[in-house]
C-alpha cells in the first residue's frame, strides 16, 4: 500500500469516527425528562383501530388529559369521548373518565399506582418515564385466566403530546389509538 493510500484511509477513518461521534454522543448522554415536565392540561383527538377496522371502519375519539402533582407523587386523569356505532349521521357517543395516582417506585423513573397492585381485581398499574415518553401500563387477569395489558404512551412533542394507546389480550393486539393533543393549560 502506498503512503498516499494509507494517509487517505487514515483520514477517512478519522472523519467517519468524528462524524459518528456527533450522532452517537447526544443519544448516549440523553436523559429522561423529569415527570413534572409532563404536567399540564392537554386536549386533542385521535383514531382508534382494531382488527375489524378494515370492514367496520375506525372510531374517532376526543381526548382530554390532565397530569399534575398529587401529594408526594403525581396523577394522570384522562377522558375519552368515543363516537362510533349507531347511525353514521348520528353516532353513539360514550364518555369515559379514569384517574390514577402514582408514587415513586424503587427504580428511577418508575412509579407505582396507588391502590392498583392486584391484577385479579383493579389491575396492576405502574408508570415509567423514558426519554420524552410517560408510559402508563395496566395489567388485568380475566375471569377465564387470560390477561389484558393496556399501555398509554404519552410523548411530549412541540406544543403538546402524542398519545399511542395499545390494548393487548393474551398476546394479541386488540385495539390501537393514535392521537395528537395540544397543551391548553398548566
Predicted regions and their residues:
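C-terminal segment of classical bacterial N-terminal signal peptides
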Residues: 17-27
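Short, exposed beta-strand-loop hairpins at the edges of beta-sheets
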Residues: 153, 164-174
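Hydrophobic/aromatic beta-strand elements that line small-molecule binding cavities or substrate pockets
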Residues: 61-67, 98-100, 122-127, 149-156, ...
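Acidic, glycine-rich flexible loop segments
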Residues: 117-158
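Bacterial N-terminal signal peptides that target proteins for export
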Residues: 1-15
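Short, solvent-exposed loop/hinge segments that bridge or flank secondary-structure elements
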Residues: 32-33, 41-77, 91-95, 147, ...
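Predominantly extracellular/secreted and cell-surface proteins with exposed
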Residues: 80-134
